Design a protein with these regions (language model features):
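Generic serine detector
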Residues: 29-31, 44, 77
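A short-motif feature that recognizes glycine-rich, charge-decorated loops
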Residues: 33-72
Length: 127
């Protein structure tokens, strides 16, 4: 399983944009912008290692993600009436299948559940 989560502000600044990545080998990385980006660039901060999940923890997380129901969501959940706010993106690969999901100014419960799982991983790693 691999996963990358991105939270991108819909404001004219990239400060505060944040992302979490879990690699197939269990390596967990994080990035949060604390300085302004170059024009038309989303990220000013590099990936930083946050820790590593062992095979059992990665398998458990994979099953927890599946159990949220996120893989059954429509690819995009967007509130077209909102201005500003936040766009969240998630790329998930489990076995041979890849999923790209977007939630913009809306909180589908399965999407939110996976974000909570990711922050739980970060907390457990002492980040």
């Amino acid at each position: 399983m691999t996963l990358e989560y991105r939270r991108i502000g819909r404001l004219p600044t990239c400060i505060g944009n944040e992302r979490i990545r879990i690699a197939a080998d269990g390596e967990v990385s994080h990035s949060r912008n604390t300085v302004e980006c170059e024009p038309d660039v989303t990220w000013s901060a590099p990936w930083r290692p946050a820790g590593r999940l062992d095979a059992a923890a990665l398998a458990r997380l994979t099953q927890q993600i599946i159990d949220t129901g996120i893989l059954g969501l429509q690819p995009e959940s967007i509130d077209e009436t909102a201005e500003g706010g936040t766009r969240e993106e998630m790329d998930i690969a489990i076995a041979e299948r890849e999923y790209r999901l977007v939630a913009e100014n809306i909180n589908p419960p399965p999407f939110r559940a996976v974000v909570k799982l990711l922050w739980g991983v970060m907390f457990e790693l002492g980040f």
